[in-house]
């Protein structure tokens, strides 16, 4: 409802606003416009959709904690912080690449980089620009975002950020163990130890998720 009203205030019709709001919150990316959000060419609509996509791709359990006035859990949540870092780093890299190659000016590069990063990371799929024509580096970054996806417990797809974080921690721990063979390590998420069984399952599932497109 909030997203629909905000889009209406931004100048859209009620039907278009409701259609876009439902697709954004569901991270479905459905749009009856042939060119997706490229048809609107307005920063206000893009910013509203970005906020909706980010909100929908976070763990919904965090909102329940906020409802209980437990704001600390939201701020210290490892997955949320990792997700925001991923969005920030990817946006910076794509902005730099688009500007450096002369594809857009600085402001426009940041605008489209942020929108496409959030759209792909949340597995929504909206487009504010035809990123298929972007430089190869930017498209590779978007491809990696597609694999990682959004947070667990959200409407987003992908491997999930929590599994990606665990996979990175396991990789780092194994690299350290090559230097210190007797090293005993434990994987932690949110200050709690992740059971070895869960770590093993996450590792196997992540490898299957990554290798499946290649096998096809």
Indicate residue ranges for each PLM-predicted region.
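Membrane-proximal intracellular helices of multi-pass ion channels
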Residues: 1-216
């Amino acid at each position: 409802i909030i997203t629909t009203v905000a889009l209406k205030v931004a100048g859209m019709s009620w039907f278009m606003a409701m259609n876009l709001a439902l697709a954004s919150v569901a991270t479905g990316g459905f749009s009856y416009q042939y060119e997706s959000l490229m048809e609107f060419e307005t920063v206000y609509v893009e910013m509203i959709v970005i906020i909706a996509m980010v909100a929908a791709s976070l763990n919904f359990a965090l909102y329940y904690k906020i409802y209980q006035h437990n704001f600390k859990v939201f701020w210290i949540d490892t997955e949320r912080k990792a997700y925001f870092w991923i969005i920030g780093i990817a946006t910076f890299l794509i902005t730099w690449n688009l500007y450096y190659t002369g594809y857009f000016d600085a402001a426009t590069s940041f605008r489209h980089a942020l929108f496409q990063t959030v759209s792909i990371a949340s597995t929504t799929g909206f487009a504010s620009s035809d990123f298929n024509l972007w430089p190869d580096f930017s498209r590779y970054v978007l491809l990696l975002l597609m694999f990682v996806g959004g947070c667990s417990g959200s409407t987003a797809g992908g491997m999930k950020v929590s599994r990606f974080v665990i996979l990175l921690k396991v990789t780092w721990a194994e690299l350290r163990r090559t230097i210190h063979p007797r090293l005993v390590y434990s994987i932690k998420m949110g200050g709690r130890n992740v059971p070895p069984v869960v770590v093993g399952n996450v590792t196997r599932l992540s490898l299957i998720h990554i290798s499946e497109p290649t096998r096809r």
